[in-house]
Swiss-Prot record:
Cystine connections: none
GO BP term, pick one: heme B biosynthetic process
Residues bound to Fe-coproporphyrin III: 131, 145-149, 172, 185
Cofactor(s) required, per the database record: Fe-coproporphyrin III
Species, as recorded: Staphylococcus aureus (strain Newman)
HAMAP family in alphabetical order: Coproheme_decarbox_1
Its biological purpose: Involved in coproporphyrin-dependent heme b biosynthesis. Catalyzes the decarboxylation of Fe-coproporphyrin III (coproheme) to heme b (protoheme IX), the last step of the pathway. The reaction occurs in a stepwise manner with a three-propionate harderoheme intermediate. The first decarboxylation step is fast and yields the three-propionate harderoheme isomer III intermediate, while the slower second decarboxylation appears to control the overall rate. H(2)O(2) is the assumed biological oxidant, but either H(2)O(2) or peracetic acid yields the same intermediates and products.
Protein name: Coproheme decarboxylase
Top-rank EC class of the record's enzyme: oxidoreductase
Domain of life: Bacteria
Gene coding for it: chdC
GO molecular function: heme binding; metal ion binding; oxidoreductase activity, acting on the CH-CH group of donors, oxygen as acceptor; peroxidase activity
Length: 250
């Protein structure tokens, strides 16, 4: 049996995608609609307080295209905290006008493919801790997609030796390093949590960088032979103080 890669796991992750039911929202009187939005703003401002205590983080983006209108991404130390957030969100009046279109449950993950040998406790390493328990950037754009490593009769990632996988992941990682300073990447593991094995969340102030890195990696052997991808979601950042304009209906 091939050796399994060991992982370091950080904050639990929940991506929630919603489409706005504009037809139903349109017939709500303006004063009631304003109250819905204010309640939603207060909820998100309250959940965002974890950032100052370094016990979680969150991001809100307006998704481009018809797959969704809003992405809410929450990071928390425990899975049950994500359940609490989602349950409380569903009780908001605005939730009656937001249609769930997709969700993804995972956990921030680092693998040992490229790690050197050390007796150090990795969870005490400041660099590793910053990646496992990150402060999310306020970049203009976000890109999220789920993915698997292929396993069929011709190409099976899980039948490769650890050395073969390490070599492939090294080459794969060298492409990613070319985009340092242009893209911030977060990998979340989801084996046993969701329908794919990993989620990839990218941040950038230049949306074109998403196309460039994904295209370039198509020529990398790790992706070309072993990568399988779900739907891609791209969007622009939206702050809670912009909700009045976002939900405004003239």
């Amino acid at each position: 049996m091939s050796q399994a890669a060991e992982t370091l796991d950080g904050w639990y992750s929940l991506h929630l995608f919603y489409a706005v039911d504009w037809a139903s929202l349109r017939i709500v009187p303006k004063d009631e609609r304003d109250a819905l939005v204010t309640e939603f703003q207060s909820f998100l401002e309250n959940t965002a307080t974890v950032r100052s205590s370094k016990s979680g983080d969150q991001a809100i983006y307006n998704i481009t295209g018809q797959k969704a209108d809003l992405l809410l991404w929450f990071l928390r130390p425990e899975m049950k905290s994500l359940n609490h957030i989602e349950n409380e969100f569903n009780k908001l009046r605005i939730a009656d006008f937001l249609i769930p279109t997709y969700s993804y449950v995972s956990v921030i993950e680092l693998s040992n493919y490229l790690a050197g040998k050390s007796d150090e406790d990795p969870y005490e390493n400041p660099h590793i801790k910053a990646r496992l328990y990150p402060e999310l950037p306020h970049s203009d754009y976000i890109c999220f997609y789920p993915m698997n490593k292929r396993r069929n009769e011709t190409y099976n990632w899980y039948m490769l030796t650890m050395e073969e996988r390490q070599k492939l992941m090294y080459d794969h990682g060298m492409i990613g390093r070319k985009y340092a300073g242009k893209i911030k990447q977060f990998i979340t593991g989801s084996v046993g949590f969701d329908d794919f094995e990993w989620g990839v969340t990218l941040f950038s102030d230049d949306v074109l960088q998403f196309k460039k890195i994904v295209y370039e990696m198509r020529f990398d052997e790790t992706t070309a032979r072993y990568g399988e991808f779900g739907s891609f979601f791209v969007g622009h950042i939206i702050n809670t103080n912009e909700f009045d304009q976002f939900f405004a209906i003239s």
